[in-house]
Amino acid sequence: MKRLIIILITTLLVSNITAQDPNRFFPKEDLILSGTYYYPEHWPRSQWERDIKKIAELGFEFTHFGEFAWSAMEPEEGKYDFEWLDEAVRLAAKYKLKVIMCTPTPTPPAWLTTKYPDILIKNENGLIVQHGARQQASWASDIYCEYVSKIVTQLAKRYGNNPVVWGWQIDNEPSHYTFAYDYSDNAQKKFRQWLKNKYKTIDSLNEIWGNEFWSQTYNNFEQILIPNQKELAGTANPHAMLDFKRYTADEAASFINFQNDILRQYASANQWITTNVRPRTASVDPARMDHLDFLSYTRYLVNGRHKGYGEQGFRISDVDPIGFSNDFIRNIKGITGVMEIQPGQVNWGRFNPQTYPGAVRLWHYHVFAGGNKFVCHYRFRQPLKGSEQYHYGTLQTDGVSVSNTGKEIVQFNKEINDLRKEYNPNSKLPVHLAKVKTAILRSSDNIWEMDFQPQTDQWNTMTHLIKYYNTLKTFGVPTDIVREDVDFSVYPVLVAPAYQLLDKELIARWTKYVNNGGHLVLTCRTGQKDRNAALWEEKLAEPIYDLIGAEELYFDHLPTDKWSIVNFNGNSYKWNNWADVITPKGNTNVWAKYEDQFYKGQVAVLNRKIGKGTVTYIGVDTDDGKLEKDVLKRIYNQVGETYDLPAGVLIEWRDGFYVGLNYTSEPQTFPINDATDKILLGTKVTEPAGVVIWKSKK
């Protein structure tokens, strides 16, 4: 109740305040600003000025304070201490550094969790998550939110009109990390209320959830428990599970929006507000955090999770961790920045290798190439104590010597300053790129639903989506990851990978898009269910039959040790993950067929002209993506000019600059024309983890 009152009061106070246009905070001629995290509370005060001065000397333009400092800001309940933070801000101003100020809400102090242990989250095994790390408090706790309101209000009043404070970061990486979902009593209570608000009556919920199945029918909302697969003898109700994931994403967004609204009451209009999301955190949907001025993100790349390309790929990473994040988060509010990026070797990965020489600089240029307005390096000094002792910083453990990877960041800072002199405010996306600009349609609902009901152990929705993204990047096409609320018509090509949950209104929009000249690509699983994750009371995926010009007969999977063949253009491709078996009708063109199994000769890929455009349906999912790449290449040959780049080689364009990035383990030659192009940085033949930047002389 207290939280509800706080939110209602806040809503009334900020009812006339909306998210600001973030572009005004970032002059285009700056290209990208570079900053670093600094934790004054970790170091003797006698070292602060030395450290902050060095931040400026190394070419950083802003610093970042406070996201884990609640116990330093409020050491005892109601006793606030900002004097130390005032001094840090004063020193930043002295050395002409901007400051990103943070709310410290991911780390509630011990006095709070001891006094109110019921604010802590509970995991799916019933374990209460203890004090001692971060993100252990429940967003659904009214008591927790009451204390959040108090500390955020104090910060906002103190720094909301301080000209040194450039902007605000709310919380840090909103999530519960390995404890992705909260099963606490607080969450249970809020989930029931969320369901009441959505369905109004228990009869409506029973109908949508299909609760006649297994006698799950409820008499009232109080009987409903959070669906917990660990506590069930059979598979959880998929409709209940989908709603729980929607609720969790709404709760996370509410927590961020709630803090945003408090800050906005007191913050100057010259200060922006954001949070830093982890783009692939399944329990959070960044688009729901719609009160913010913009979203930023966190990215770590070398930690044993990414194979990369070639012998040294594990030290450089894949192209998609930064690339996909750029193109996804940027399109939520029109801009983005990287609030936290890996500085070198870390401490928490599956294994923690040294990064390849140049890799950290490469990542910073990938951030730049993706249109980001700033990049913030985590962290300036390597900690001597605590859980991240072996986490690199710009400086080594002596606090004065620049680390090997820190030197790469300092180099980037200098080079960006030089690159600003080449900025042309009149630059526009070249025509050959505009003709092939592409959108990939992404839906949190689809990811949640299919990953709960994958149908085969080999299925992963994000892996499927990323495969298409990485393929498009080998063509060098400008790519946006978008939601359904965008104008499809601005994109010559629209790809909707495995878009299983949809409605007939979306199908009508797709049809209009194609009729007007767009090129639509749909893939396996698309159209099988409605928005509530119910199968249509029609043939399998029948609502899309008229659009794709075919009927889907059934789908198939194979064991992991067996492979079957698809033939496309006389070439054979292996698959064993997913196969939609389809029968074309009318004037539909057959592009690929299955070569074996009992459905030998049936169709795997088809293409159809409608009006001025085309629709292509790729019904098979391969592991290596070679079939999908060749099919997409055939489509783009009809649309415009593209590159043919090796996997791990990127060409991006921003603000008049072509940026070539080599994520591979071998030297790569970029298609730079000596007669018409001018190299600004690097060389045409680029070493592993190397960068080349050029612009057209025209």
PLM ranges: what are they?
Residues 221-224, 269, 300-301, 309-698:
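Carbohydrate-binding surfaces of carbohydrate-active enzymes
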Residues 33-45, 66-83, 130-149, 174-180, ...:
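The substrate-binding groove and active-site-proximal loops of carbohydrate-active enzymes
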Residues 26-31, 56, 64-67, 73-78, ...:
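Aromatic- and acidic-residue-enriched carbohydrate-binding clefts of CAZyme catalytic domains
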Residues 49-129, 153-156, 259-267, 500-501:
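Aromatic-lined substrate-binding rim segments of carbohydrate-active enzymes
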Residues 19-62, 75, 90-94, 98, ...:
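N-terminal carbohydrate-binding accessory modules
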Residues 4-13:
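Sec-dependent N-terminal signal peptides
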Residues 42-57, 148-154, 277-288, 356-364, ...:
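Short, acidic/polar
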Residues 129-324:
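Polysaccharide-binding and catalytic clefts of secreted carbohydrate-active enzymes
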